[in-house]
């Protein structure tokens, strides 16, 4: 092998290869408890936001909810999220951050503790009640 090839041919370290074998053979079910927990969090948010009038397609493989802001509220997703953050100290992401077709939507993560999610949903309900257009 010439000197040049020594720097072009690489592989994972032997230790890392053995660790990968162990993880793939013995750790197949290690993620199952977290999967159950994430589904619980997702379903809780879906229920609470649907009650508030958000339209949501249930995600099957992500840690995020992408929800349509209900009619009768400011449809400017950036302003909606900015006002919510300022008034309720909870961050959600405006849909427009994901492109022009995301306008009118918001994105929330459910990769947070259940306590944090419950607080966020309580504050979102308060915010929606305070900002409903008559």
Show which residues each predicted segment covers.
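PLP-dependent class I/II
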Residues: 4-134
């Amino acid at each position: 092998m010439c000197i040049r090839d020594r720097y072009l041919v690489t592989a994972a370290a032997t230790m890392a290869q053995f660790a990968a074998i162990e993880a793939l053979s013995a750790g197949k079910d290690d993620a199952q408890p977290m999967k159950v927990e994430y589904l619980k969090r997702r379903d809780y948010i879906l229920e609470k936001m649907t009650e508030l009038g958000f339209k949501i397609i249930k995600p099957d493989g992500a840690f995020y909810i992408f929800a349509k802001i209900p009619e009768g509220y400011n449809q400017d997703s950036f302003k909606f999220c900015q006002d919510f953050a300022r008034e309720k100290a909870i961050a959600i992401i405006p849909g427009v951050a994901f492109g022009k077709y995301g306008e009118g939507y918001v994105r929330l993560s459910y990769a947070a503790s259940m306590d944090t999610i419950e607080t966020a949903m309580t504050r979102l309900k308060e915010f929606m009640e305070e900002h409903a257009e008559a």
